[in-house]
From Swiss-Prot:
Protein name, UniProt field: Leucine--tRNA ligase, cytoplasmic
GO process annotations (BP): cellular response to amino acid starvation; cellular response to amino acid stimulus; cellular response to L-leucine; cellular response to leucine starvation; glutaminyl-tRNA aminoacylation; leucyl-tRNA aminoacylation; positive regulation of GTPase activity; positive regulation of TOR signaling
Residue positions of motif 'KMSKS' region: 716-720
Highest taxon in the source lineage: Eukaryota
Source organism of this protein record: Homo sapiens (Human)
Purpose of the protein: Aminoacyl-tRNA synthetase that catalyzes the specific attachment of leucine to its cognate tRNA (tRNA(Leu)). It performs tRNA aminoacylation in a two-step reaction: Leu is initially activated by ATP to form a leucyl-adenylate (Leu-AMP) intermediate; then the leucyl moiety is transferred to the acceptor 3' end of the tRNA to yield leucyl-tRNA. To improve the fidelity of catalytic reactions, it is also able to hydrolyze misactivated aminoacyl-adenylate intermediates (pre-transfer editing) and mischarged aminoacyl-tRNAs (post-transfer editing).
UniProt main location, coarse: cytoplasm
Domain notes: The structure of cytoplasmic leucine-tRNA ligase includes four main functional domains: the Rossmann-fold aminoacylation domain, the editing domain known as connective peptide 1 (CP1), the anticodon binding domain for tRNA recognition, and the vertebrate C-terminal (VC) domain for tRNA binding.
One Pfam family of this chain: tRNA-synt_1
Enzyme class: ligase
Keyword Phosphoprotein attributed: yes
Subunit structure: Part of the aminoacyl-tRNA synthetase multienzyme complex, also known as multisynthetase complex (MSC), that is composed of the aminoacyl-tRNA ligases for Arg (RARS1), Asp (DARS1), Gln (QARS1), Ile (IARS1), Leu (LARS1), Lys (KARS1), Met (MARS1) the bifunctional ligase for Glu and Pro (EPRS1) and the auxiliary subunits AIMP1/p43, AIMP2/p38 and EEF1E1/p18.
């Protein structure tokens, strides 16, 4: 039962969503054609795209978060009257799908079908996380395949497929790559449709040569790029098998599928004379220990160099005659990268053990230490890097731990012959400031985690995890030349600086071990390949021009683009393995996935007219155009304004229709993506648009919005920990609108965002409550107040609605969706709740329905299904998808401020009343609780008391002189302290200054005004009924502070009224209800001087909560006040011998004699000690 209760509201929302989606589908709301729109372009068009997701699995919440930004933007721009297009393609190009299919095929060959795998234990994952593994990899260079990223925890592909819930019969089909293309794309579309995406699905397609139209489009793009000299042929880094003598692609690998080359900066540490005895035979040669680092930006902080005493090293001769010292394994890699005279040959000149070069003196680039020494580290591994490790103890936990070991342990130094002067003088050098960790992050974290030595592997792994990612994304450089710049922006610049100075080289090795099928361990080699020459000066210059005019919504994104344009060189655009389009002039090569995805947004504009609603482009073409007819000249005509009409059998009006679509929709108004795509895909996107339309800058991208990664409940999303949600799971759990609301609330900046499940649950409740309230208002239309909407609270509410429209409009415009949700839903609902509470005379019908309409429109981009449903409840004939953004009326800021003032005063009075009722601490009081006050006088000040007036004048003077800032308290205190008129009040002055400063931050400069902008007394008097009811008092009066005693006059200031509570004395009477079986009881009540029927009934209602309506209660008195109450009541004769009390009658109380008289029409009557009340 409880379970059902838990899903009722979600089920309600999901039911609405299903109905609304069918309605949109039937009405084809999101299908748009340029030919129909050109007549109505007064407000312009809006074309938005999202990087098509890769089709080797279901879409997850991370994808959904990024694409929600497109979705919300389109929803908003539709309301602003623009013609909106949001198309959605699906990416299948590249190696992962083919590699997975081939892996399955191989498992079936080896182990049968279904496979019977051996019971051998899976390789144990290394628990110690090596420094390099946590560093942010440069995704444009060493791009880990998505297959590796999504492999889950199973060693076998069959197991991975099984974890997706597939049966053995279904899994077999996935051994053919084509089946992946049939299976996952329809599921992606199904999931996205359930989300309610505003997509024109006719324009969707999958990539690769499976779709002949898209294939033809990519071939055209590459022929054009080659024609324009953007594509070159030459050496590029690739995984290579020396034994096989050729590149080793995924399908040729025994292990290491999806592994790519990893780029290091190879640091040259020059050995100084006198050389260690083992190297003495090489006198006259330049000898370098070469260290591979992923963190060139930290090299300013080198204090020493590490080698492992018991590891074998070699010295080999490089192509220019220098000697490099490193491991044999690293030298083998280098020999295929142009380091040696002959490719693949390592000319060894010396074999040595690490201990034989300990204590050698070195000169290292960038560091402030002139000489550093080779010291022992016992944890260096042979399988990564060069076996030589440069030491930066300021930023590497491993290095500070090992250095402290040597400093603390004299015996350890003695064992390896290390002198004190080689270790003790060397202290960590501040290089990077990391928020929360300071400028020596490794020192801080090692102290925090109490790391004792270099053998605390687990703690060191934790330390690295905590500081490396944060350092990359948030670290700020402290060294000259780069001071104040972000690490991620200067990493490449510093690397280039060292390479240009001859102090470093680029070195590559495989990210992980790769074994070829011939059981050969692969290396990274320079091999001939086709590449895009992104480093070419003119191309870079033009792309920089494009970037200048690009809206990035955030400075960090722009800096990231600028940094990328600074270091980006060649990008290999061809592979020999995988799925994709073949290079038109060299068919053995396939175009890789980061290269066929740069201008496909142009294909969206015409796809629906070419491929007939079929993802594979295999259905009949709506224009009757065959793929073979789409020659290079035809594509030129469609996409290039000046291109002549081609020789073709296609009718001119058909090609003009394609051209019209492109000209109408281009350029792309917004592209949204995760920030990790800025250094690769998004930069290539700019480059390729500039290359394809060099003379037409009006076709270049207009805006790019990059967002942070999505956390789930404040933790990283991960399948292995179970903290993971697919898109379809999220909709099942929260409904589409519930999920969308939480996505909007997750975050706006390039910092990590957070999807909080509790927020999604709370959102569901809010949405459900909101629609129920709307239904209630529609049902109670007649009972809502009509006539002029002119009360104080009517006018405040109207102003708050208009202010909400304006603020929310600005937030949507800037794509600050979390803020738009705050101003357009949370604060908007709060304004309604406040109005409902304050409007004691009832809410105004016109305002209530204006509010519902405006709220529905402001929320529609986030929760379109529910808003469409409410739109229908309001009796609107058309879809909300065709509605317009609400028009904001005038905003009376003064009125809004006065309402805020009213809420603050009410809050303060409640607190003061609570304190008044609490007995003073330390005083012995009677056990009797304090009696609640009945009356209150509120004192308001027209002007500040003289001491506050003087203080404020001083503050305002400083504020205006300091460009809107106040100086330190010391400065203010010394000036105020020297003023004779303030001497007496100094104890009060600084607390008053502190209050003003605090309010200045919240409310702005108006807090320094010497008078309020509204009439304080009038605001309180207009709301006196609300205040009286809210505090449950009998009566409140409002007076000026000038009428009060000195203490109040001195402390009362504008905007901060003071008050006095009191108990008005009265005489107690019995209030008796003689009606049988109605649940109303008899009670005692105080009657006070001047009371009338209304005040007594209100007092009764506070005691008898069963009475809801004042007008339903009548009071009567006994004709005989003495004997009447003593007679036994007779059923059916409740009114006998009693007289109704008129509402005009006034009660007079004689406190001395404890008697009460009633005065009515000049007649005075004694009422005794009992009154009758009747409830009808």
């Amino acid at each position: 039962m409880a379970e059902r209760k838990g899903t009722a509201k979600v089920d309600f929302l999901k039911k609405i969503e299903k109905e609304i989606q069918q309605k949109w589908d039937t009405e084809r709301v999101f299908e748009v054609n340029a030919s129909n729109l050109e007549k109505q372009t007064s407000k312009g068009k809006y074309f938005v795209t999202f990087p098509y997701p890769y089709m080797n699995g279901r879409l997850h919440l991370g994808h959904t978060f990024s694409l929600s930004k497109c979705e919300f933007a389109v929803g908003y721009q539709r309301l602003k009257g623009k013609c909106c297009l949001f198309p959605f393609g699906l990416h299948c190009t590249g190696m992962p799908i083919k590699a997975c299919a081939d892996k399955l095929k191989r498992e079936i060959e080896l182990y049968g079908c279904p496979p019977d795998f051996p019971d051998e234990e899976e390789e144990e994952e290394e628990t110690s996380v090596k420094t390099e593994d946590i560093i942010i990899k440069d995704k444009a260079k060493g791009k880990k395949s998505k297959a590796a990223a999504k492999a889950g925890s199973s060693k076998y592909q069959w197991g991975i497929m099984k974890s997706l819930g597939l049966s053995d019969e279904e899994i077999v089909k996935f051994s053919e790559a084509e089946h992946w293309l049939d299976y996952f794309p329809p599921l992606a579309i199904q999931d996205l449709k359930r989300m309610g995406l505003k997509v024109d699905w006719r324009r969707s397609f999958i990539t690769t040569d499976v779709n002949p139209y898209y294939d033809s489009f990519v071939r055209w793009q590459f022929l054009t790029l080659r024609e324009r000299n953007k594509i070159k042929f030459g050496k590029r880094y690739t995984i290579y098998s020396p034994k096989d003598g050729q590149p080793c692609m995924d399908h040729d690998r025994q292990t290491g599928e999806g592994v790519g080359p990893q780029e290091y900066t190879l640091l040259k540490l020059k050995v100084l004379e006198p050389y260690p005895s083992k190297l003495s035979g090489l006198k006259g040669k330049n000898i370098f220990l070469v260290a591979a680092t992923l963190r060139p930006e930290t090299m300013f902080g080198q204090t020493n160099c590490w080698v492992r005493p018991d590891m074998k090293y070699i010295g080999f001769e490089t192509v220019n005659g220098d000697i490099f010292i490193c491991t044999q394994k690293a030298a083998r890699n280098m020999s295929y990268q142009g380091f040696t005279k002959d490719n693949g040959v390592v000319p060894v000149v010396k074999e040595l053990m690490g201990e034989e070069i300990l204590g050698a003196s070195l000169s290292a680039p960038l560091t402030s230490y002139k000489v550093i020494y080779v010291l022992p580290m016992l944890t260096i591994k042979e399988d990564k890097g060069t076996g030589v490790v440069t030491s930066v103890p300021s930023d590497s936990p491993d290095d500070i731990a090992a250095l402290r070991d040597l400093k603390k342990k004299q015996a350890l130094r003695a064992k390896y012959g290390i002198r004190d002067d080689m270790v003790l003088p060397f202290e960590p050098v501040p290089v990077i400031e990391i928020p929360g960790f300071g400028n020596l992050s490794a020192v801080t974290i090692c102290d925090e985690l109490k790391i004792q030595s270099q053998n605390d592997r687990e703690k060191l792994a934790e330390a690295k995890e905590k500081i490396y990612l944060k350092g990359f994304y948030e670290g700020i450089m402290l060294v000259d030349g780069f001071k104040g710049q972000k690490v991620q922006d200067v990493k490449k610049t510093i690397q280039k600086k060292m390479i240009d100075a001859g102090d470093a080289l680029i070195y590559m090795e495989p990210e992980k071990q790769v074994m070829s099928r011939s059981s050969d361990e692969c290396v990274v080699a320079l091999c001939d390949q086709w590449y895009l020459d992104y480093g070419e000066e003119n191309w870079k210059k033009q792309t920089s021009q494009c970037l200048k005019n690009l809206e990035t919504f955030c400075e960090e994104t722009r800096r990231n683009f600028e940094a990328t344009l600074g270091w980006l060189q060649e990008h290999a655009c061809s592979r020999t393995y995988g799925l994709g389009t073949h290079l038109p002039w060299d068919e053995q090569w396939l175009i890789e996935s980061l290269s066929d995805s740069t201008i496909y947004m142009a294909f969206y504009t015409v796809a629906h007219l070419l491929q007939g609603g079929n993802l594979h482009g295999q259905a009949e073409s709506p224009l009757g155009i065959r793929p073979q007819q789409m020659t290079k000249e035809v594509w030129d005509y469609v996409f290039f304004k000046e291109a002549p009409f081609p020789k073709t059998q296609i009718a001119k009006e058909k090609l003009d229709q394609l051209k019209q679509e492109f000209e109408f929709w281009y350029p792309v108004d917004l592209r949204v993506s995760g920030k990790d795509l800025v250094p690769n895909h998004l930069s290539y996107y700019l480059y390729n648009h500039v290359a394809m339309w060099p003379e037409q800058s009006d076709k270049w991208p207009t805006a790019v919005r990059a967002n942070g990664h999505l956390l789930l409940n404040s933790e990283k999303m991960s399948k292995s920990t179970g903290n993971f949600l697919t898109l379809t799971q999220a909709i099942d759990k929260f409904s589409a609108d519930g999920m969308r609301l939480a996505l909007a609330d997750a975050g706006d900046t390039v910092e990590d965002a957070n999807f909080v499940e509790a927020m999604a649950d709370a959102g569901i409740l809010r949405l459900y409550t909101w629609v129920e309230w709307v239904k209630e208002m529609v049902a109670n239309w007649d009972s809502l107040r009509s006539g002029p909407a002119s009360t104080f609270n009517d006018r405040v509410f109207a102003s708050e609605l208009n202010a909400g429209i304006i603020k929310t409009d600005q937030n949507y415009e800037k794509m600050m969706f979390k803020e738009a949700l705050k101003t357009g839903f949370f604060e908007f609902q709060a304004a309604k709740d406040k109005y409902r509470e304050l409007a004691v005379e009832g809410m105004h019908r016109e305002l209530v329905f204006r509010f519902i309409e405006v709220q529905t429109l402001l929320l529609a981009p986030f929760c379109p299904h529910l808003c469409e449903h409410i739109w229908t409840l309001l009796g609107k004939p058309d879809s909300i998808m065709n509605a317009s953004w609400p028009v904001a009326g005038p905003v009376n800021e003064v009125l809004i401020h006065s309402s805020q003032y009213l809420m603050e005063v009410t809050h303060d009075l409640r607190l003061r009343l609570k304190n008044y009722m609490m007995p003073a601490k330390g005083k012995k009081t009677d056990k009797q609780p304090l009696q609640k006050p009945s009356h209150c006088t509120i004192y308001v000040a027209k002007n500040y008391p003289p001491w506050q007036h003087t203080t404020l004048s001083v503050l305002r003077k400083h504020f205006e002189a300091n460009n809107g800032k106040l100086p330190d308290n010391k400065v203010i205190a010394s000036e105020l302290g020297s003023m004779p008129e303030l001497k007496k009040y100094m104890k009060k002055v600084m607390p008053f200054v502190a209050m003003i400063k605090e309010n200045l931050e919240k409310m702005g400069p108006r807090i320094l005004d010497l008078q309020l902008e509204f009439d304080e007394k009038a605001v309180l008097m207009e709301n006196i009924v609300y205040l009286t009811n809210s505090l449950e008092l009998e009566h409140i009066e409002v007076k000026f502070a000038s009428e009060a005693e000195d203490k109040i006059r001195e402390d009362c200031c504008p905007g901060k009224p003071l008050n006095v509570f009191r108990i008005e004395p009265g005489v107690s009477v019995s209030l008796v209800n003689p009606q049988p079986s109605n649940g109303h009881f008899s009670t005692k009540i105080e009657i006070r001087q001047g009371d009338n029927c209304d005040s007594i009934i209100r007092r009764l209602m506070k005691m008898n909560r069963g009475i809801k309506d004042l007008s339903k209660v009548k009071l009567m008195r006994f004709d005989d006040p003495l004997l009447g109450p003593r007679r036994v009541p007779v059923l059916g004769k409740e009114y006998t011998e009693k007289t109704p009390i008129s509402e005009h009658a006034v009660f007079n109380v004689d406190l001395m004699s404890k008697k009460i008289h009633l005065t009515e029409n000049g007649i005075r009557v004694d009422i005794g000690d009992t009154i009758i009340y009747l409830v009808h």
